[in-house]
């Protein structure tokens, strides 16, 4: 269900929704950063106030304004004067851009909200995986719930549901088998259980063909970054590839289907 396509709106309305989407992305980028840090340190991201990771001082409202607080404080904690990681403003700006890109693709619609939740989950789990090499189940559960709840509003027929659910289970089973075989052959853990569950969610959102391209793209990028490293988290590469396919994958999927004449 699309409320507004941006192409149908006047220029000032387009600017309004773009700015709104960017601010929404900033706010959620800040929240996801905090949530990821708390999850990685076995803390609840629902209870308690935000704190400085250096001095543990509770942060006030003026410390939590996305981007603005970082710039105003000169990139340092107002209490202990220790430098604040540049990761915070970068992720806030980045997720603001991600939000705008999805708005341009989906318009003001339920699909935008669904994709926003999906991107939020990918973003959060990537930050956690980068820090502790684990993908939190909660992010995957939220993504699955968002997908299910969106179905009545995006004109999803039974064929759509069967294809996407089938792709989800297909990817999960295929990578589970591959992981077991590779673990046996190499004598060590290869693909983590979190990665397998993430592929399930990717199949649910993207379907079979776009999901396959996601696997290929994630593997290529991961191989490039893996040079000289003994271990890398795979979740961020899957997430980046999945988001790129979510936004730009339709032409690639259409080309592939036409090539095999489906």
Question: Can you annotate each of these PLM segments?
Answer:
Residues 21, 112, 117-223, 255, ...:
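Functional transmembrane core segments of multi-pass inner-membrane proteins
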Residues 91-98, 139-147, 196-198, 234-239:
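Core segments of transmembrane alpha-helices
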Residues 248-262:
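Juxtamembrane boundary at the C-terminal end of a transmembrane helix
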């Amino acid at each position: 269900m699309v409320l507004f396509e941006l192409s149908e709106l006047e220029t000032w309305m387009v600017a309004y929704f773009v700015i709104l989407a960017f601010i929404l992305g900033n706010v959620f980028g800040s929240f996801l950063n905090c949530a990821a840090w708390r999850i990685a340190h076995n803390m609840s991201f629902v209870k308690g106030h935000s704190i400085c990771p250096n001095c543990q001082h509770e942060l006030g409202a003026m410390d939590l304004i996305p981007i603005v607080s970082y710039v105003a404080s000169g990139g340092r904690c107002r209490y202990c004067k220790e430098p604040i990681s540049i990761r915070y403003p970068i992720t806030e700006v980045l997720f603001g851009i991600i939000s705008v890109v999805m708005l341009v693709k989906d318009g003001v619609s339920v699909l935008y909200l669904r994709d926003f939740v999906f991107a939020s989950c990918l973003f959060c789990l990537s930050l956690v995986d980068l820090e502790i090499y684990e993908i939190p189940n909660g992010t995957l559960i939220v993504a699955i719930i968002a997908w299910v709840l969106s179905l009545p509003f995006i004109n999803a027929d039974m064929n759509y549901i069967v294809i996407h659910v089938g792709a989800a289970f297909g990817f999960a089973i295929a990578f589970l088998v591959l992981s077991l075989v590779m673990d046996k052959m190499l004598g060590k853990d290869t693909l983590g259980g979190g990665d397998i569950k993430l592929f399930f969610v990717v199949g649910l959102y993207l379907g079979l063909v776009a999901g396959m391209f996601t696997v290929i793209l994630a593997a290529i990028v991961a191989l490039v970054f893996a040079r000289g490293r003994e271990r890398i988290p795979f979740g961020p590469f899957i997430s980046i590839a999945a988001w790129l396919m979510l936004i730009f994958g339709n032409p690639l999927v259409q080309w592939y289907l036409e090539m095999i004449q489906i």
